[in-house]
Swiss-Prot record:
Keyword Magnesium: yes
Family, similarity comment: Belongs to the claudin family.
Top-rank taxon, per record: Eukaryota
Gene this chain is encoded by: Cldn16
Organism of origin: Rattus norvegicus (Rat)
Protein name: Claudin-16
Domain text: The first extracellular loop contains negatively charged amino acids that affect cation selectivity.
Length: 235
């Protein structure tokens, strides 16, 4: 059961980390929902904006200005949150790999491996927090912006909805939460694995046997009175 939970958490962690990284690097956080011309598909990401022609499939991308330039608060905060989530998720996944029983790292220290799994689970739980905040905040902002335009009967020629990159960010964050929950539960389910449990009575028996044998081989010195009493009894 322990191995099954570890492998399930590892499976979730690797896909969640991949989803977060792909979501951060791709450009489809916003996609056009209603295009009056219907000749192109526009996608906006955290780093650039791309337009794909619907007829010939030609794709052109324009990068945003330098990171030091002024950008909307939504873009800057989402960048920071997603990069933080990527780093934490990657660190948690590497720590989890070292804690797996099938990995030959500290094979004689199972209690340390359990602690590594606990640390990995904690880091993954923390990694899911900025990821879900950044993804949901971006999606809500896009929805509110679109709803406000519709409410005021304003049509700018194109309206956006959140795209698959935003969905990947949410999925990766939820996967980190689930993997972290599995790993932290593993520590309590298998908390009996420790240094005391690794050395059972059978391994401690030689020490007690040696102590008994040494006690048997040890003979207290006889006093002069005892020696005289022994001689008298022989006579």
């Amino acid at each position: 059961m322990k191995d099954l939970l570890q492998y399930a958490a590892c499976f979730l962690a690797i896909f969640s980390t991949g989803f977060l990284i792909v979501a951060t690097r791709t450009d489809c956080w916003m996609v056009n929902a209603d295009d009056s011309l219907e000749v192109s598909t526009k996608c906006r990401g955290l780093w650039w904006e791309c337009v794909t022609n619907a007829f010939d499939g030609i794709r052109t991308c324009d990068e945003y200005d330098s990171i030091y330039a002024e950008h909307p608060l939504k873009l800057v905060v989402t960048r920071a949150l997603m990069i933080t989530a990527d780093i934490l998720a990657g660190f948690g996944f590497i720590t989890l790999l070292l804690g797996l029983d099938c990995v030959k790292f500290l094979p004689d220290e199972p209690h340390i491996k359990v602690r590594l799994c606990f640390v990995a689970g904690t880091v993954l739980l923390i990694a899911g927090t900025p990821g879900i905040i950044g993804s949901v905040w971006y999606a809500v902002d896009v929805y509110v912006e679109r709803s406000s335009l519709v409410l005021h009967n304003i049509f700018l020629g194109i309206q956006y909805k959140f795209g698959w990159s935003c969905w990947l960010g949410m999925a990766g964050s939820l996967g980190c939460f689930l993997a972290g929950a599995l790993l932290t539960c593993c520590l309590y389910l298998f908390k009996d694995v420790g240094p005391e449990r690794n050395y059972p009575y059978a391994m401690r028996k030689p020490y007690s046997t040696a102590g008994v044998s040494m006690a048997k081989s040890y003979k207290a010195p006889r006093t002069e009175t005892a020696k005289m009493y022994a001689v008298d009894t022989r006579v």
